[in-house]
A protein has these predicted regions:
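Short, flexible, mixed-charge glycine/proline-rich loop motifs
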Residues: 39-51, 86-92
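An alpha-helix initiation/capping motif
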Residues: 71-75, 95-98
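Divalent metal-coordination and catalytic microenvironments
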Residues: 32, 77, 100
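Short Fe-S-cluster ligation motifs
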Residues: 80-102
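The canonical Cys-X-X-Cys-His
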Residues: 52-62, 94-104
């Protein structure tokens, strides 16, 4: 019995250690209008942490689809932050989603009361 459990554990470890299948060549982001393909992953991470949302907040099942209005709003917000950050001469990102949203879907319009 002990050997059977050990064998099953080894098989489970070997199974989970396998690489995930790689996406086919050309399977990168589609329908990009504001971001470059190399910026997408970082920008999505910034949005999810800055607004406290998940991918499905803006994206339909077909990630390239524009069917959800929130995706169009997100595009405008990404463009706005790019324009603001372009005004800083050091080239660094000074403004992010979190700057206004503070981890919530709707930005606070006033400081919280103490």
């Amino acid at each position: 019995m002990r050997q059977l459990i050990l064998a099953l554990a080894i098989c489970a470890v070997a199974l989970f250690a396998q690489d995930a299948p790689h996406p086919p060549v050309g399977a990168g982001p589609k329908n990009l209008k504001v971001l470059k393909a190399t910026e997408v992953r970082a920008a999505m991470g910034m949005a999810t942490s800055g607004l406290g949302v998940t991918c499905t907040e803006c994206h339909a099942a077909d990630m390239s689809s524009d069917e959800k209005p929130m995706k169009l709003t997100a595009r405008m917000m990404f463009q706005m932050t790019q324009e603001i950050n372009a005004k800083f001469p050091d080239g660094k990102m000074h403004v992010t989603c979190y700057s206004c949203h503070r981890g919530t879907k709707e930005p606070l319009m006033a400081a919280p009361k103490a």
